[in-house]
Amino acid sequence: MDIMKKIELEHLRMDLPKFRSGDTVKVHLRIVEGEKERIQMFQGNVIRIHRGTTGGTFTVRKVSDGVGVERVFPLHSPFIDRVELITEGRVRRSRLYYLRDLRGKAARIKPKNRF
């Protein structure tokens, strides 16, 4: 079992910022199309984080042209170039699935008060 832990530790990313559910993040994805490589950004609210070793994921939700878009990203994926923390949100839940049913201003997350 120690061999498996060593292999998993080699693939963990240590450059990710500390973020929680409710935070607004910008994920920079590395996309390879043929021989070309480009960076695509996805900005939205983190509605779920599943931590773990190499199998951890986080879900980001944004509204694009009035349509809600959710995307699940592996935490330790080599295709993620970087994750930027834009704002920290103040929420009382870890799973923010209720945002799917809210529209407009009601779907906003209050910013965290920093004193």
Curated annotation (Swiss-Prot):
Q: Which UniProt keywords apply?
A: Ribonucleoprotein, Ribosomal protein
Q: Does the keyword Heme apply?
A: no
Q: Which InterPro entries match?
A: Ribosomal_bL19 (IPR001857), Ribosomal_bL19_CS (IPR018257), Ribosomal_bL19_sf (IPR038657), Translation_prot_SH3-like_sf (IPR008991)
Transmembrane stretches in the record are: none
Keyword flag Ribonucleoprotein: yes
A single GO BP term for this record reads: translation
A Pfam family for this UniProt protein? Ribosomal_L19
| Molecular function GO labels | structural constituent of ribosome
Question: Which family does the entry's similarity section mention?
Answer: Belongs to the bacterial ribosomal protein bL19 family.
**HAMAP family this protein is in?**
Ribosomal_bL19
Main role? This protein is located at the 30S-50S ribosomal subunit interface and may play a role in the structure and function of the aminoacyl-tRNA binding site.
Name of this chain's protein: Large ribosomal subunit protein bL19
